[in-house]
Every structure is written in structure tokens, then in C-alpha cells.
């Protein structure tokens, strides 16, 4: 496909927005889903200060801004800011005119219907796209792994969900959703670092903690044993240099933080961990297809890239499943972007071209057409 008519694929995550052209093997633009507004009054005239900043620019000026994420738990909570992010995506990052390209958007399963209707409306009415489609994130991850059957455990910044898919069909009755993901882990790390005597409170400092989390955290294979090791020696301690040059030391926090994925009670949540959620999702499926799901458990999303997470999932699910069951956890190296990659594959298939919602269909039926045309 040519860039001039290629479809645009935009994976709007709660934490990062991934965007690019269908047929490419990686997104061209990856930037934080942040809109920042100045905290202070501008006093220098003629500096061209803006009333809002998006993405990396907001991130780099975070010291003077209040940062807001318009997508929380996979659901858009602020449409004005969301429009700014889309505008930034098309005009500044991809440098395309959205009225010339079909646009594929993604969303979390079990999202409110109004959410996808509003997405559809903005695409056609604000950006005048010729055609668009909304795809379920986990389904795209499975496409990207080259499978048509499997269960996807997709965990990003805002939401985690397990989606069993059989022969290309998602099984909606067995989809489970857990509102515990990367952002909750960042907040939890802020909390446990405070207990160590380091104070992180502002929206800008949260971004520093997110960086600590991404660079130093890992999942322990055996949590209790790891805690004992950490208590008896300093072998697990690592140091991190803050932007102001101060160096902090972090020990058992490195694995206590992501442990909350397996023990949500750490965050005061009553829900099951990601291993049990995956198991429960499989158990909601027909008994005949469970074997195929156990053998094709695919991890996807940025919160699944902690070192050690695949081995731990293997261990936990093996303990829950029947003893003779073959269990395989697939953790593709590109899983941070597998939703986007799956979207790129889908939007460039010749068989997909009749699936788009066209501007004409939208004008005839209104936003509710999205429920009829997009699973």
C-alpha cells in the first residue's frame, strides 16, 4: 500500500499513543497520551506560550505543567483533550490529512458503548475521515502473533483484560477485565518509595517514578523467597539517579511493585490476580476448546514486559490447571506494540476492505453504526 492512500492505524492507549501506516511493521509515532496545561501565569511576552501541550512536548516541559491523561482505564474521560491528542497525531506526528485516509482505531473490550460512538462521531465530524473502524485491542495482538486461536492477556497502562479467541472469534461471555494496570503500579511504587523516605507527589514526579518502574522492576518467581533474599542481603539493591542528580536506592520495591499484578490485595483491591483472571477466563469457555487456550496464552501490552513475568505466569497457571494440561505462555519480543502491529496487519488485508464504515454509511445511520459493523 502507498503512503498516500494507506490506512492510518492509531492505538490510543491510556499511557502511550501508537500511530502509523497500515502495512508498516512498527508504529512511526509513539508518544505519551498526555495533555499538559501551564500551572503558572506567563510573564514573558512574545514567547509564543501555548495554553496546552501534547505528548513528548508536555513531558519535556512537565516541571511547569499540570499533566492529565484523557484516557483512564481504557475509557476516554475527557473528549476535548482526546481531540487534541488525535489532532497532534495526524498533523504533527504523522503529518497527514485525516480526510484523505481511512482510520483504524482500537479500544479495550467491555468498554461503554457511548465511548466508541463518540470516537466514531469525532472521526467523521471533526476530522472528516472517509472511512473508519474500531477494533478490539486483544484481538489485534493475537493477529500479530500469527494465531487465530488463543487467549490474550493484554495489560497496558490503564486496563488489563483476558480475551479468549477461537478461530478468529472473540468469545464475549468469557472476556474478563481487570482495572489494574501500569498506572496503578506506578502509583503503588510512589507509595512504597514514600515509605522508604523518598517523597514523590506531583504529576511530574509520577513520571520519574514510572521511569524507575520501567528500568528497575521485575517479577519474582517466588515472592516470599525473594523477600527473604532482599532482607538478608543487599544483592537485589539498585540505584537510580534522579533528574536533579540525587541518587536513590531501591531494594525489595523492585519486585514488590509488579507483585500487585498477582496479588491485587497489595493495592487494597479485592479482585483476582492476572493469573487467576486468565484461568477464570479459560474456565468460562467450552470444555472442548480449553486445551487450545492453555497452549496458546499470549501476553501483550507494556505491563507484560517485566523480566520474569512469563515464567511466573507459567508457574501460577500450571498450579491452577489440570495436572496433565500442556501450558504454554507466549511472550513475543515486540509485545509492547503488538496491538498496533495487529492493526497494521488487519487494515492492510484485502478481505478487510469491505469492513470499513464509510462516511456515507455514517451519514445514513449515525454513530450507532459502529456497533453493527465493528465487533
From Swiss-Prot:
ISGylated. The modification Tele-methylhistidine is found at residue 73. InterPro entries: Actin, Actin/actin-like_CS, Actin_CS, ATPase_NBD. GO terms for cellular component: actin cytoskeleton; cytoskeleton; dense body; focal adhesion; nucleus; plasma membrane; protein-containing complex. One of its GO terms (molecular function) is ATP binding. It is found in: Cytoplasm, Cytoskeleton; Nucleus. The keyword Cytoplasm applies. The modification N-acetylaspartate is found at residue 2. Gene3D superfamilies: 3.30.420.40, Actin, Chain A, domain 4. Its EC number is 3.6.4.-. It is an enzyme of class 3 (hydrolase). The modification N6-methyllysine is found at residue 84. It catalyses: ATP + H2O = ADP + phosphate + H(+). The modification Methionine (R)-sulfoxide is found at residues 44, 47. The modification N-acetylmethionine is found at residue 1. Keywords: Acetylation, ATP-binding, Cytoplasm, Cytoskeleton, Hydrolase, Methylation, Nucleotide-binding, Nucleus, Oxidation, Ubl conjugation. SMART domains: ACTIN (SM00268). Actin is a highly conserved protein that polymerizes to produce filaments that form cross-linked networks in the cytoplasm of cells. Actin exists in both monomeric (G-actin) and polymeric (F-actin) forms, both forms playing key functions, such as cell motility and contraction. In addition to their role in the cytoplasmic cytoskeleton, G- and F-actin also localize in the nucleus, and regulate gene transcription and motility and repair of damaged DNA. Belongs to the actin family. Polymerization of globular actin (G-actin) leads to a structural filament (F-actin) in the form of a two-stranded helix. Each actin can bind to 4 others. Identified in a IGF2BP1-dependent mRNP granule complex containing untranslated mRNAs. Component of the BAF complex, which includes at least actin (ACTB), ARID1A, ARID1B/BAF250, SMARCA2, SMARCA4/BRG1, ACTL6A/BAF53, ACTL6B/BAF53B, SMARCE1/BAF57 SMARCC1/BAF155, SMARCC2/BAF170, SMARCB1/SNF5/INI1, and one or more of SMARCD1/BAF60A, SMARCD2/BAF60B, or SMARCD3/BAF60C. In muscle cells, the BAF complex also contains DPF3. In vertebrates 3 main groups of actin isoforms, alpha, beta and gamma have been identified. The alpha actins are found in muscle tissues and are a major constituent of the contractile apparatus. The beta and gamma actins coexist in most cell types as components of the cytoskeleton and as mediators of internal cell motility. This is Actin, cytoplasmic 1. The gene is ACTB.
Amino acid at each position: 500500500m502507498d503512503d498516500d492512500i494507506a490506512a492510518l492505524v492509531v492505538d490510543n492507549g491510556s499511557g502511550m499513543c501508537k500511530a502509523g501506516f497500515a502495512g508498516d511493521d512498527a508504529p512511526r509515532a509513539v508518544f505519551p497520551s498526555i495533555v499538559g496545561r501551564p500551572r503558572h501565569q506567563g510573564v514573558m511576552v512574545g514567547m509564543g506560550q501555548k495554553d496546552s501541550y501534547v505528548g513528548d512536548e508536555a513531558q519535556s516541559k512537565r516541571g511547569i505543567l499540570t499533566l492529565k491523561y484523557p484516557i483512564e482505564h481504557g475509557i476516554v474521560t475527557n473528549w476535548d483533550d482526546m481531540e487534541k491528542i488525535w489532532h497532534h497525531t495526524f498533523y504533527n506526528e504523522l503529518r497527514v490529512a485525516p480526510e484523505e485516509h481511512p482510520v483504524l482505531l482500537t479500544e479495550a473490550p467491555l468498554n461503554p458503548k457511548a465511548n466508541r460512538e463518540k470516537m466514531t462521531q469525532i472521526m467523521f465530524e471533526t476530522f472528516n475521515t472517509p472511512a473508519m473502524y474500531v477494533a478490539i485491542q486483544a484481538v489485534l495482538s493475537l493477529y500479530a502473533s500469527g494465531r487465530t486461536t488463543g487467549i490474550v492477556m493484554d495489560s497496558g497502562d490503564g486496563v488489563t483484560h483476558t480475551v479468549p479467541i477461537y478461530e478468529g472469534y472473540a468469545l464475549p461471555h468469557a472476556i474478563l477485565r481487570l482495572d489494574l494496570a501500569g498506572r496503578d503500579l506506578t502509583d503503588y511504587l510512589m507509595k512504597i518509595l514514600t515509605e522508604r523516605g523518598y517523597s514523590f507527589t506531583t504529576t511530574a514526579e509520577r513520571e520519574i517514578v514510572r521511569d524507575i518502574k520501567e528500568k528497575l522492576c521485575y517479577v519474582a518467581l517466588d515472592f516470599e523467597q525473594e523477600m527473604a533474599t532482599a532482607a538478608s542481603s543487599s544483592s537485589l539493591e539498585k540505584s537510580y539517579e534522579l533528574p536533579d542528580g540525587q541518587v536513590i536506592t531501591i531494594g525489595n520495591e523492585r519486585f514488590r511493585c509488579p507483585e500487585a499484578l498477582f496479588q491485587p490485595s497489595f493495592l487494597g483491591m479485592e479482585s483476582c490476580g492476572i493469573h487467576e483472571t486468565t484461568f477464570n477466563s479459560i474456565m468460562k469457555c467450552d470444555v472442548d476448546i480449553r486445551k487450545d487456550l492453555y497452549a496458546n496464552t499470549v501476553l501483550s501490552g507494556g505491563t507484560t514486559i517485566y523480566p520474569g513475568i512469563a515464567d511466573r505466569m507459567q508457574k501460577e497457571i500450571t498450579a491452577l490447571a489440570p495436572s496433565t494440561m500442556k501450558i504454554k505462555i507466549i511472550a513475543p519480543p515486540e509485545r509492547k506494540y503488538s496491538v498496533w502491529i495487529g492493526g497494521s496487519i488487519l487494515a492492510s488485508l484485502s478481505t478487510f476492505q469491505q469492513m470499513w464504515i464509510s462516511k456515507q454509511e455514517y451519514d445514513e445511520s449515525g454513530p450507532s453504526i459502529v456497533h453493527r459493523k465493528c465487533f
